[in-house]
From Swiss-Prot:
Its EC number is 2.1.3.-. It catalyses: prephenate + S-adenosyl-L-methionine = carboxy-S-adenosyl-L-methionine + 3-phenylpyruvate + H2O. Belongs to the class I-like SAM-binding methyltransferase superfamily. Cx-SAM synthase family. This is Carboxy-S-adenosyl-L-methionine synthase. The gene is cmoA.
């Protein structure tokens, strides 16, 4: 696994964060060291798949990156006729995802698409995963995507939505941001790396509060919505149709 050193040296003209070749190469290391609880969420996605994925249905991972979520799902599904569709708009991510999945044998067919998740049809779905993806969409596009997911889910289908959160209480919000930065430093990132990456993400990742997510999911049609995992200002929600 390649180590993430992308922000270790001063960058004179720091642009917006993009999921390009350099990020795709180090992504597994980057996300493990940057997102508290990421491994737990990936493991639990597999557990949820074993409960919710049904025979002759589709599973979607929207923003699949290098395929960690898909692998977890595939290892835990024993139903007949299941098809997994992974979507990511980064060609370098898609290329690595395909190679990664090919390294592990499975009888469950997987299709990896390089596309905008807003343009992908959701149909006959027993499970949809949005793992730290929605926060990169323009806010005005989020409800429409969630409505499309709701309409494409079968009854009793599940949506797993993992996100970085903001908190309405400013004291709590600043505390959790600081704890997250402490977590990153404990994982070997320098103060410069933490600062430069935060700046690069400012214009591309727009986070919402848990209450905002819940209200939006309910507006999209979901009635059963709750938080099942949280570590600092990162967490995951489960919604059932």
């Amino acid at each position: 696994m390649s180590k993430d050193t992308l922000f270790s040296a001063p960058i004179e003209k720091l642009g917006d964060f993009i999921f390009d070749e350099s990020v795709a190469e180090v992504f597994p290391d980057m996300i493990q060291r940057s997102v508290p609880g990421y491994s737990n969420i990936i493991t639990a996605i597999g557990m949820l798949a074993s409960r919710f994925v049904t025979d002759q249905s589709n599973v979607y991972d929207l923003g699949c990156s290098r395929g960690a979520g898909i692998l977890s799902i595939r290892r835990n599904v024993e139903k007949a006729g299941v098809r997994i569709i992974g979507v990511d708009n980064s060609e370098p991510m898609v290329e690595r995802c395909r190679r990664h999945l090919e390294a592990y044998h499975s009888d469950i067919p997987v299709e990896i698409l390089c596309d905008d998740i807003r343009h992908v049809e959701i149909k006959n779905a027993s499970m949809v995963v949005l793992n730290f993806t929605l926060q990169f969409l323009p806010r005005e596009d989020r409800l429409a995507l969630l409505r499309k997911i709701y309409q494409g889910l079968n009854p009793n289908g599940v949506l797993v939505l993992s996100e970085k959160f903001t908190f309405e209480d400013n004291t709590i919000n600043e505390l959790l941001i600081d704890l997250h930065h402490t977590f990153k430093r404990a994982n070997g990132y320098s103060e410069l790396e933490v600062s430069q990456k935060r700046t690069a993400l400012e214009n591309v990742m727009r986070t919402d509060s848990i209450d905002t997510h819940k209200a939006r999911l309910k507006e999209a049609g979901f009635s059963q919505v709750d938080l099942w995992f949280q570590c600092f200002n990162f967490g995951s929600m489960i919604t059932i149709k």
